């Protein structure tokens, strides 16, 4: 009986691999991109690209686990949720008050060690803010 359950789970695992999430990959360079709107110091621009842009822009640099389900589904849901809260690729579309509020939220989240997410720091060592 244990073998049957194992084989069933193995087949199920293989089948779910056929259902890959949509990827957040855009090569478009938008005028509304934060770095196109403001001249940022290189250190800040580098910090944003290594710690924030994978979840908060229109272009995610995915690790290999995106191809393994259900990890890929989980990761894509986090990217979608992250872009809903803040999208640097569309930063210029925010109203001035909203943009200021988002920048304040970034500062607070980083000070309280809530961002980047722990799971992201685990596979992206460049994102550790120490």
Q: Where are each of the predicted segments found?
A:
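Acidic helix-start/capping segments at beta-turn-to-alpha-helix junctions
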Residues: 62-76
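Start-of-domain marker
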Residues: 37-45, 61
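Short, exposed beta-strand-loop hairpins at the edges of beta-sheets
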Residues: 126-130
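Post-cleavage N-terminal segment of exported redox proteins
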Residues: 1-38
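Short, compositionally biased low-complexity segments
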Residues: 19-20, 40, 49, 76-80, ...
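Extracytoplasmic electron-transfer domains, predominantly the class I c-type cytochrome c fold
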Residues: 73-122
């Amino acid at each position: 009986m244990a073998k049957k359950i194992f084989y069933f789970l193995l087949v199920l695992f293989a089948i779910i691999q056929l259902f890959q999430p949509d990827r957040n990959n855009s090569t478009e360079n938008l005028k509304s991109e934060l770095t196109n709107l403001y001249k940022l110091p290189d250190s800040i621009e580098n910090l944003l690209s290594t710690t924030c842009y994978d979840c908060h822009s229109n272009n995610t640099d995915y690790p290999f686990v995106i191809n393994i389900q259900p990890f890929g589904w989980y990761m894509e849901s986090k990217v979608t949720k992250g872009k809903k809260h803040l999208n640097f690729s569309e930063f210029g579309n925010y109203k001035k008050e909203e943009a200021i509020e988002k920048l304040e939220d970034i500062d607070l989240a980083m000070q309280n060690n809530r961002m980047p997410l722990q799971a992201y720091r685990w596979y992206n060592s460049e994102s550790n803010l120490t």
